Amino acid sequence: MARPALLGELLVLLLWTATVGQVAAATEVQPPVTNLSVSVENLCTIIWTWSPPEGASPNCTLRYFSHFDDQQDKKIAPETHRKEELPLDEKICLQVGSQCSANESEKPSPLVKKCISPPEGDPESAVTELKCIWHNLSYMKCSWLPGRNTSPDTHYTLYYWYSSLEKSRQCENIYREGQHIACSFKLTKVEPSFEHQNVQIMVKDNAGKIRPSCKIVSLTSYVKPDPPHIKHLLLKNGALLVQWKNPQNFRSRCLTYEVEVNNTQTDRHNILEVEEDKCQNSESDRNMEGTSCFQLPGVLADAVYTVRVRVKTNKLCFDDNKLWSDWSEAQSIGKEQNSTFYTTMLLTIPVFVAVAVIILLFYLKRLKIIIFPPIPDPGKIFKEMFGDQNDDTLHWKKYDIYEKQSKEETDSVVLIENLKKAAP
């Protein structure tokens, strides 16, 4: 009986000793790591490696604490390396220390720092506004603007890499879009988890005169689907039913939809967001794989409806939900009353009204004499009898009754007498 009790006490003593040793090791500050180095793989993969500290406590299960200079991305792990995909646009420094637990509150060893400098070259020569969009999960298109201190005849080269590639590849299809320069390359899903990877992009020139630019593109961001295809439009029971085919490579639950509905009776552009499938009673083949539908109630019977649809990714499957696809090709349905008849009527009615008004004016002028004949005025008779003289007087009043004297003229008068002879 004494031997089992002795063994139990010995086991407890050993456990207590180990615990005390671990606690002592945990509270003890460990030596710093050694041989810290940094290197670059692929295009933008930075790898820091180091060796365990010399003289570490034997009871310590080493963990390594690391973070960047801005105290971001703190990490505690047992590995003696750290790998990150980072753009090489500026100086990047990592600090590493050792400790005996994964507790962040534990004080690590003195930190050792190692930095990597940005690529050589004038920062103003690097390309700007470098962005990449994954189109319909089929190809990636990257575009950029030339740097400020760049020659107009610079020939650019774009390289890309992702984990499924053994080495980086060069994009061959470089072209211009206005002021932007762009390049497209095929990029499809190669494995189920491919969407959760990153693509490393680097743009530089053939002559090595500009600073290379590196960008890390997450495949769950900046995804732009192709426009959907409208399959059916149906007017039934005062409602408009719309069914469309979703773009390939996407599951319906990973997309958000917008439907634009316009009609000839109003000038409003109605854009409606589709939150759920509302075509429960649709007679079309709505259960076909990759199709979605929408129902708009309260449509007008005498109007033509024009419909367009567009889609974007949602955050159920992707990190980004801002890039809408282009609008689908518009399709119309409905019957409108004969607009030619109304147009003709609108043009002819004013002409008829104008002609009728002119005829009526002439007719009223003659009709006035018949309806309103002149009334005899007895006073006019006396006015004519007694008023003529006054009128004549007034008429002659404006004339001068005295004639102006003309100039006197004097003529000589010769008297000729005819003398008769006296009788003898």
Curated annotation (Swiss-Prot):
Keywords: Disulfide bond, Glycoprotein, Membrane, Receptor, Repeat, Signal, Transmembrane, Transmembrane helix. Residues 32-121, 224-336 form the Fibronectin type-III domain. GO terms for molecular function: cytokine receptor activity. Spleen, liver, thymus, heart, lung, kidney, testis, stomach, brain, skin, and colon; but not skeletal muscle. Residues 26-340 are extracellular. A motif (WSXWS motif) lies at residues 324-328. The WSXWS motif appears to be necessary for proper protein folding and thereby efficient intracellular transport and cell-surface receptor binding. Belongs to the type I cytokine receptor family. Type 5 subfamily. Interleukin-13 receptor is a complex of IL4R, IL13RA1, and possibly other components. Interacts with TRAF3IP1. Interacts with IL4. This is Interleukin-13 receptor subunit alpha-1. It comes from Mus musculus. The lineage of its organism: Eukaryota, Metazoa, Chordata, Craniata, Vertebrata. The gene is Il13ra1.
